[in-house]
């Protein structure tokens, strides 16, 4: 046991300020995602056309070539969609989707039917044969046929080969008078304008979130209007349809383009107002959230739906929108954390003083709200039992580490004896984990979320403990000192990659600076006291 020694009077206010600020941050963050946000209203709740993929249940994915969706399931989906949409767009003839036109006809819906073109010529030929048969069987239901979706973007066919596929379908169904098109990101029509010669109308995708220069929500619809006008000018006399446009409700922010439910609702409402004002053919993406896309595109890939995976509308087209209706659970998590931290320490004499209890309450509340924040992110991001197990284990470790740190900090602030820092291997592990994830964000961060709620509690705990440590409770190893310098540098790179427009990257920088500063403060004190001996990594 370390005898009580009062921390410097200069650091006490800073330690208390850090605890109060962390608790207030938890209060404010949960409150702001729970407030109702007034948005422009859509002219109607009906939408002209929506992308339809039925793969919304656990384990369903078109990446499984043997996947099959029954006609009964498609019927149930289209019956629900017919209440809000006049048309659905499909992307393939496989997986049972060739039944969509016949079923859509029952509900008075039109279909923008897709024929999937990929790299395999055999699969392409099978798709085309099935598509031609469907077109000839149900021409009156089809608003158009899309031969290939973003094939040039994926680099799976040359423009010449793709044009041959489109022409093959167009010639085969000429007598049905069903128009044939190809769909791709708008820039690729600029790169390959010759594709316009083989289609009846031009179908462009405009996704402001995914632009090379991401567009902020407030400017997104104006961006769509500008691009649409530009494409009309570049292809004079040709009909141009927006084949995909939308906004994600969850996932990583790209520069100023924040994925959120409020922003998705804002975008859809403003886009529908714009589309109605120019009488423009369009299709929005997409009907249902698609969990399988999270494997390819991270969290954000799974949350472009207007309906969730249970076929429930995620937001209305009129009235205010709330980002998180269950926001009070975040506050309750803070209260639970405060109670847990007090119960974990109150049985020892050194934590019974009033100041010590205040410190435990503030620490527990801040930790509880932060881990609730992390759990909310996990709710949207985790795809399977393994990911839940790994993420849950890390959260438990963060909780246990923070409890141990809070007990030590509370004893120092309360003037009681301390019993040493938590296991130094835990400290090293958190620094190593933060460094490793920082490297992943820098070199492979396009689809990775910022796990802020996981790292903030231990980072802040170690920082406050370093401020209050008057002895040699923590002498950082050489490896820890190296990571203390590297972590902020990596975080600065993430800020620069988002050109300073992403608040999450700034918070990530704050986490790295906080934990890095803790190590450097401890080292500076050890040098001053002459307790710094050559250190190596913990065995």
Task: Specify the residue positions occupied by each region the protein language model found.
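Substrate-binding cleft of secreted/luminal carbohydrate-active enzymes
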Residues: 48, 248, 255-318
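Conserved, mostly hydrophobic/aromatic
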Residues: 50, 88, 145, 202, ...
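N-terminal carbohydrate-binding/catalytic regions of secreted carbohydrate-active enzymes
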Residues: 51-128
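Substrate-binding cleft of extracellular glycoside hydrolase catalytic domains
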Residues: 64, 100-179
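Aromatic- and acid-rich polysaccharide-binding/catalytic face
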Residues: 107, 113, 143, 149, ...
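Aromatic-lined carbohydrate-recognition surfaces of secreted/lumenal glycan-active proteins
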Residues: 115, 170-190, 237-243, 280-290
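Glycoside hydrolase catalytic-domain groove-lining segments
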Residues: 210-251, 448-453, 477
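Alpha-helical transmembrane segments of integral membrane proteins
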Residues: 351-539
């Amino acid at each position: 046991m370390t005898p009580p020694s009062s921390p410097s009077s200069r650091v006490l206010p800073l330690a208390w300020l850090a605890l109060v600020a962390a608790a207030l941050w938890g209060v404010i963050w949960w409150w702001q995602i729970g407030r109702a946000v007034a948005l422009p209203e859509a002219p109607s709740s009906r939408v002209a056309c929506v992308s339809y993929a039925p793969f919304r249940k656990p384990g369903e994915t078109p990446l499984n070539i043997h996947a099959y969706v029954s006609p009964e399931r498609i019927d149930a989906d289209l019956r629900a969609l017919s209440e809000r949409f006049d048309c659905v767009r499909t992307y393939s003839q496989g997986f049972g989707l060739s039944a969509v036109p016949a079923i859509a006809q029952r509900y008075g819906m039109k279909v923008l039917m897709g024929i999937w073109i990929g790299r395999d010529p055999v699969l392409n030929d099978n798709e085309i044969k099935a598509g031609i048969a469907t077109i000839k069987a149900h021409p009156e239901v089809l608003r158009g046929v899309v031969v290939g979706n973003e094939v040039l973007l994926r680099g799976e066919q040359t423009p010449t080969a793709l044009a041959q596929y489109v022409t093959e379908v167009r010639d085969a169904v000429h007598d049905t008078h069903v128009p044939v098109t190809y769909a791709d990101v708008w820039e690729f029509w600029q790169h390959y304008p010759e594709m316009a010669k083989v289609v009846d109308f031009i179908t462009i995708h405009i996704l402001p979130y995914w632009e090379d220069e991401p567009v902020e929500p407030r400017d997104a619809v104006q961006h769509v209007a500008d691009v649409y006008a530009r494409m009309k000018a570049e292809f004079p006399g040709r009909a141009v349809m927006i084949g995909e446009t939308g906004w994600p409700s969850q996932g990583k922010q790209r520069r100023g383009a924040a994925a959120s439910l409020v922003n998705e609702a804002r975008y859809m409402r403003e886009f529908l107002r714009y589309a109605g004002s120019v009488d423009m053919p369009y299709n929005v993406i997409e009907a249902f959230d698609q969990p399988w896309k999270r494997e390819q595109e991270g969290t954000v890939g799974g949350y472009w739906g207007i309906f969730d995976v249970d076929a429930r509308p995620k937001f209305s087209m009129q009235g205010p929108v709330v980002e998180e209706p269950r926001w009070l659970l975040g506050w309750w998590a803070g209260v639970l954390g405060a109670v847990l931290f007090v119960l974990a320490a109150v049985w020892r004499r050194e934590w019974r003083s009033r100041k010590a209890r205040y410190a435990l309450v503030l620490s527990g509340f801040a930790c509880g709200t932060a881990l609730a924040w992390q759990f909310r992110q996990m709710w949207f991001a985790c795809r399977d039992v393994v990911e839940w197990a790994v993420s849950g284990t890390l959260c438990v470790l963060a909780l246990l580490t923070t409890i141990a740190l809070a007990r030590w900090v509370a004893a120092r602030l309360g003037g009681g004896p301390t019993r040493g820092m938590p296991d130094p291997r835990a400290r090293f592990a958190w620094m190593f984990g933060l460094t490793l994830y920082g490297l992943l964000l820098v070199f492979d961060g396009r689809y990775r979320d910022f796990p802020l709620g996981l790292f903030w509690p231990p980072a802040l705990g170690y920082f406050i403990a370093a401020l209050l440590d008057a002895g040699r409770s923590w002498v950082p190893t050489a490896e820890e000192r190296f990571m203390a310098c590297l972590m902020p540098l990596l975080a600065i790179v993430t800020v620069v990659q988002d050109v300073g427009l992403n608040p999450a990257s700034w918070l990530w920088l704050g986490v790295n600076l906080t934990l890095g500063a803790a190590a450097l403060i401890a080292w500076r004190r050890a040098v001053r006291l002459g307790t710094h001996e050559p250190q190596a990594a913990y065995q």
